[in-house]
Amino acid sequence: MTVTVEPSITTGPIAGSSKAYREVAGPDGVTLRVPLRRVHLSTGADFDLYDTSGPYTDPNAVIDLAVGLPARPGLVRDRGTQLQRARAGEITAEMAFIAAREGMSAELVRDEVALGRAVIPANHNHPESEPMVIGKAFAVKVNANIGNSAVTSSIAEEVDKMVWATRWGADTIMDLSTGKNIHETREWILRNSPVPVGTVPIYQALEKVKGDPTELTWELYRDTVIEQCEQGVDYMTVHAGVLLRYVPLTAKRVTGIVSRGGSIMAAWCLAHHRESFLYTNFEELCDILARYDVTFSLGDGLRPGSIADANDAAQFAELRTLGELTKIAKAHGVQVMIEGPGHVPMHKIVENVRLEEELCEEAPFYTLGPLATDIAPAYDHITSAIGAAIIAQAGTAMLCYVTPKEHLGLPDRKDVKDGVIAYKIAAHAGDLAKGHPHAQERDNALSQARFEFRWNDQFALSLDPDTAREYHDETLPAEPAKTAHFCSMCGPKFCSMRITRDVRDYAAKHGLDSEEAIEAALEAGMAEKSAEFADHGNRVYLPITQ
């Protein structure tokens, strides 16, 4: 770390909860401490949640960003990749750790990795990372993009964004820096990141040739990849599917090639009128990544950047090539996931998942959104979360977040949180729709707290306790309001849940606690009214008495 940096980061537990650990036995007698966020309910019970925040929410942890986070136990560097070891029937320390995190069996984790339907991004040189899995059999994950640009940001700001994003649930981070101090920025992020870190090596390679794509070479790119592998990057986006013959297919698009990596490689192919060096040297690239157990994230350089271009010939031609490259990577023991679009209207989203599964041997799908409409700049975290929820239900394993600044500028701290929360909603909605084990438990716990007017429990169980409390307290800030049987929306007279509870209390008081009892009460009431009608001479209309 050659650059002096003094980041200011947020630490300490999330409101209403504490950092806790579950100890599980790993291979070779290693004890693994699996992190979780423990919510303390007013009922006296605890509710445990998946936690991505690392030591930053642990009040007992010593945080020194200049030193970095401690290495995880059980790390093995000389036994091959997670894919190779899974195929050999081995349950690694990472698999045991993940099984405890996901509430699944270690055998399931191993089998999904062995089949190529899940990946464990865990570079041997990133021991600070807490193991996680990306695959459709597991909870849908969320990636947060950070990184500087030539125009703005600093190392300190990007480290802060990383800590902030993981606090709110980012499962992985991608450092997409394109400005100054790319190597140093990545080093600070890696040494302090509790989650896997991904990159797009072509960005740094382009910076080395002063931004001229035509000056790129395989040798320069290869050395950049090795440099990043040595640092500890866990997965790399490689746009090896952008072939020379596919570039003309984008000519009539509304928005052309919108992927930075895709446009760089398209420019190189056209300038040299040769096939992409990423494609022609792919097997050598596999050998490099296998040495470090770095996961391929095969990039969708020809993804659609507008609704008009969704599911076109260029997009799916590249996807077919990514399927071919997937087979090659797996043959070299390298883990693979596939990147997906982009901008896709809702009725065309599922086709993307089905085709990816068919062409790419069910390798985990990792999608940017997709945005379901193009008309809402400043709200693209919403337009894309709509598409993200649909594609998650269909089988996408990881969602790359989109922030409100998409298409407008570099996201700041607030944008990062807004993007992460929007995508945690989409991911969880996808898990619910898939019937993922345990997904509904949190919904049930929060709904029960809502019905019982346990306001503090509602806040603590939510994705964003701080904002939930803030919104409630804007109109009812007094502490007694935290136990009140209403909020400022309906007030004490019109709260549907309070009225429902009153009805239930009345029913309980009068023994109406079953369908049979209610039916009997109804019959008795009808009989009473029938007798009353007879007593009045069976007359429909009675004279008015003064």
UniProtKB/Swiss-Prot annotation:
One of its GO terms (cellular component) is cytosol. The keyword Cell membrane does not apply. Binds 1 [4Fe-4S] cluster per subunit. The cluster is coordinated with 3 cysteines and an exchangeable S-adenosyl-L-methionine. Gene3D superfamilies: 6.10.250.620, Radical SAM ThiC family, central domain. Pfam families: ThiC-associated (PF13667), ThiC_Rad_SAM (PF01964). GO terms for molecular function: 4 iron, 4 sulfur cluster binding; carbon-carbon lyase activity; zinc ion binding. This is Phosphomethylpyrimidine synthase. It comes from Mycobacterium ulcerans (strain Agy99). The gene is thiC.
